[in-house]
Amino acid sequence: MSALIINEYREQGGTAISFPEDISRARQKLFRFLDNRFDSDQYRENVRELTPAIMAVLPVEFRTRLAPQNDTMSLIASAMKECSEAKQAVLLNAPEHQKMKEVSEGIASLFRLMPEQVGPLMTMVTSMLGVI
């Protein structure tokens, strides 16, 4: 992961921080910045400088935990992931509690696509299912 961060930083045109070519030494330098054991302002600034590269290489599920994305593409990506996991749970005949968890997460992720319309959507869905 550290090599990905460093390479992405360089590809984004980052020049304020120099990293050694040896990946072990570069990794050590990166982790010193992130750990910041001595509460250094310079290390904090280095992490700020590296943040776009770090966010670019993180998997979506970790990225949204650090900085929740409310843009349409992130919401759609999340909905696709959650619905895919729900379908897998059903196809693989997972235990009932696992299917319930995955399906409910999929449904919630779809509602997040239109948060201002959750009430009307709930009404429509329940009437389509014949619950009302």
Swiss-Prot record:
It comes from the Viruses. InterPro entries: YdaT_toxin, YdaT_toxin_sf. May be involved in activation of synthesis of the CI protein. This is Regulatory protein CII. Pfam families: YdaT_toxin. Gene3D superfamilies: Putative bacterial toxin ydaT. Keywords: Early protein.
